[in-house]
Design a protein with these regions (language model features):
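Acidic, proline/glycine-enriched N-terminal capping motif
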Residues: 1-88, 93-95
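Acidic, low-complexity central loop/insert segments
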Residues: 96-182
Length: 182
């Protein structure tokens, strides 16, 4: 049975077109498909990505552990950086694409779309590494498009310029409209 995200009541007021996406109700369209596409390409579009699976991996050597599972060499990432990669099975077949957020060498947040990702990490985790599925505890909005930074800049006192906040990085000290965000 599909779950509602924290943003469902607001979205429900905007659309009656829903689909099950990884166990969560997600709007299939809010206004018009072409209009939404253009907004994302030309201005900005806000999307509920709560359904993406978030997994925290922590303990001594967490980064090295994750590096042995994803296709990208995430060992080269510094704290605050994000890497895009893939998970493959033992035959090299792609299971899922993912992002890996490095908080420290011992604290990693993984984001993918599939429940199998969490189970894979759990199954392969060596002693001392904890794997915690945190999807339900982490509502996830994604603002995408060329005007995204300008729109958010008016809602925070943090510098969100490309120079101060480069692409594929994250910070945990940012508030948007007074709400802490990750």
């Amino acid at each position: 049975m599909s779950k509602e995200t924290a943003f469902h009541p607001r979205l429900q007021a905007m659309t009656d077109q829903w689909m099950d996406l990884f166990g969560y109700w997600a709007p299939s369209v809010v206004t018009d498909t072409l209009e939404e596409y253009r907004a994302c390409r030309e201005t900005a579009a806000l999307m509920d990505f709560t359904m993406l699976r978030k997994v925290d991996i922590a303990g001594p050597g967490a980064l090295a552990f994750v590096n042995g599972i994803v296709t990208r060499d995430v060992s080269k990432l510094d704290p605050g950086q994000i890497g895009y990669g893939a998970l493959c099975d033992e035959n090299g077949k792609m299971i899922d694409d993912c992002t890996v957020m490095v908080r420290s060498a011992d604290d990693i947040r993984f984001c993918g779309a599939n429940d199998r990702d969490f189970h894979l990490f759990q199954e392969l985790a060596p002693p001392g590494i904890t794997v915690s599925e945190i999807t339900d505890a982490t509502p996830h909005l994604c603002l995408q498009g060329p005007l995204s930074r300008a729109m958010l800049q008016g809602l925070t006192n943090q510098d969100l310029s490309n120079a101060a906040f480069p692409y594929y990085t994250f910070r945990e000290d940012v508030e948007i409209a007074g709400i802490p965000v990750f």
